[in-house]
Amino acid sequence: MEKNCITVVKVGGAVVEDSSRLSELLDNFCKIEGRKLLVHGGGRSATKIAAALGIDSRMVNGRRITDAEMLRVVTMVYGGLVNKNIVAQLQARGGNALGLTGADMDVVRSHKREVKDVDYGFVGDVDTVDGSRLADLIESGVVPVMAPLTHDGKGNILNTNADTIASETAKALSAYYDVTLVYAFEKVGVLADSDDEGSVIRCLDKEKFEKYVADGTIAGGMLPKLENAFAAIKAGVKRVAITKDTDLEVRCGTMIE
């Protein structure tokens, strides 16, 4: 039986922090036909508010170190300030949006990341996404807006990479829908030269990705984004793209193969 289609859009923290760009993205998001779901980051907002509170932000390989103080900050910022701002803006555009963290309805459960070379602190690696509950919401006309917070089922909130939330959610929904996953951020796509917007890599497969990682072309925060993109394709997500926040139709971005 043919499945219905759904578009999962993940919007990055740089766009979330810029009110005019976020407004334009939400305009375009609302124009997407059919079922849709939004996952947001908010790292820049968290860093900014942490600094105002005198809390240092530490990153390793594009991933945030989340100690107890930073966990309180990201919970406030991701689950509150950023999420509810997006929900309110979607409501103003006629979207029946519902803000969620992974703890709400037990939608995303995770475990605290094991300490290996780096202790990331209160960071969660996803165990399960309840695609059935999300599908029930979506079929009732709700547009879920998911913050990058999960829980371990023992009363603990964990900070989880938003790209991972998007990928794992897309994978879970692929049991019910034909899923298109779009990573929307401040650049036109994956660039061969980070200073040249004209150097976008139009198609990227795993072999090319590994080559670009080895020679340093792809590094930092792009690494987890692409690792999650390839995991989604492998798990049955139909289409994955990385593109500029103004290009949700993916006319100019990078397609993952």
Which stretches of residues belong to each language-model region?
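C-terminal catalytic "cap/lid" subdomain
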Residues: 1-257
